[in-house]
Amino acid sequence: MTSNDTIAAIATPPGRGGIGIVRISGTNLESLARGILGKLPDPRHAGLFSFLDQNSQIIDQGIALYFPSPHSYTGEEVLELQGHGGPAVMNLLLDRCLQLGARLAEPGEFTLRAFLNDKLDLAQAEGVADLIAASTANAARCAVRSLHGEFSSTIHQLVSALIDLRVLVEATLDFPEEEIDFLQSAHAAEQLATIRAKLEQVLVASRQGNLLQEGIKVVLAGQPNVGKSSLLNRLAGDEVAIVTDIPGTTRDTVRQSIEIEGIPLHLIDTAGLRETSDIVEQHGIARTYAAIEQADLVLLLVDSRHGVTEEDRSVLTRLPERLPVLTVHNKIDLSAQPPRLEENTSGPTIYLSAINGEGIELLRAALLKTAGWQANIAGEGAYMARQRHLQALIQAKELLERAAAWLHRADQLEILAEELRLAQQALSSITGEFTSDDLLGEIFSSFCIGK
């Protein structure tokens, strides 16, 4: 995974802009700097330079910044060339760096080198990418907390507490005749209970952060002409779907992303579900069920004038059992019913009008609740957790549940010790202490080139 060669890349987005940056990282950048700038800039001082080609002709004029090792982003020597942000200028400058011995950086390679040089751990490195990719203000704030090490610090505290408990258990194994009394006197059960409670708090906060990052996929399903497209337009605040009185107008899925309290909701309007001989409409219905398979939540729309019909119940039987369903009785403006939310054994039911907006706020609140959103946690305490973080936390939780069961079994302390070891390993994988090269490659390959 390690490499001592010099890498270079354009660090700013493609296209035209006021400023463009070429970033270089490696060892012994003096010769490269002399080839472009005429000299190595003073460390950590911005200087105005002419950027030169191989014939000493000026490519551009701009700012150069030099960061000596180890006090740089990557932990290596880093040189940043800040010029005018035209693509031709940036490419000429990058080509000059490659002529002088640098190679083009792979996606995420600067941050990978920062990780390998202990400038940040794996969760912080992922925080860099999450901050760049954040689509909402709340997601950006959570990503900054991860980048600054708040998530990692919490994980390290859990790992440290587990190590202390493991030391106690391993020591007990050396004195089998006193093992249970020894563990009881050291309050091992209380220590384990404290670790499990803290882990549960971290898992809840991480789920909130994952929700901020990923959002939820919501499919609008139902029979033709119940107002699915009208509801999509109402939630989106724009005319993103065609609305007519003709059943079967929507033949394909229409996708639109919105935010509710900073949570991305990926809405998918679908073809009306009914028996039809129309080949095109049949394809649309097939795509509807394909979208439902990938959804996190289904809004089943029905006409409030008719209520839930046998056809609607037939649709419900075809939905995956794991999938939460919100039943929406639309068109209350025509049925003269008040907007309301009813909690039923089958799930929440909302009465609303997509045309005049009555009951829409009830739907928004129900969407957040069903998604698991907890504003009191997510405001300042959520961690920008990825799916792999959640999997590691859940694995550690299950291992510690089993460990608690083994704790009072004098003849099974070896199993207890192993469960604790595996739980520690699962948590340590979050920060990269136990991580395969394949996983590192997968994580950093999703980064931008130049980062």
UniProtKB/Swiss-Prot annotation:
TrmE-type G domain mapped to chain residues: 215-372
EC number: 3.6.-.-
Keyword annotations: Cytoplasm, GTP-binding, Hydrolase, Magnesium, Metal-binding, Nucleotide-binding, Potassium, tRNA processing
Cellular localization per UniProt: Cytoplasm
Superkingdom classification of source: Bacteria
Keyword field contains Disulfide bond: no
HAMAP family (UniProt xref): GTPase_MnmE
Assembly and interaction partners: Homodimer. Heterotetramer of two MnmE and two MnmG subunits.
The protein's name: tRNA modification GTPase MnmE
Organism encoding this protein: Nitrosomonas europaea (strain ATCC 19718 / CIP 103999 / KCTC 2705 / NBRC 14298)
Gene behind the chain: mnmE
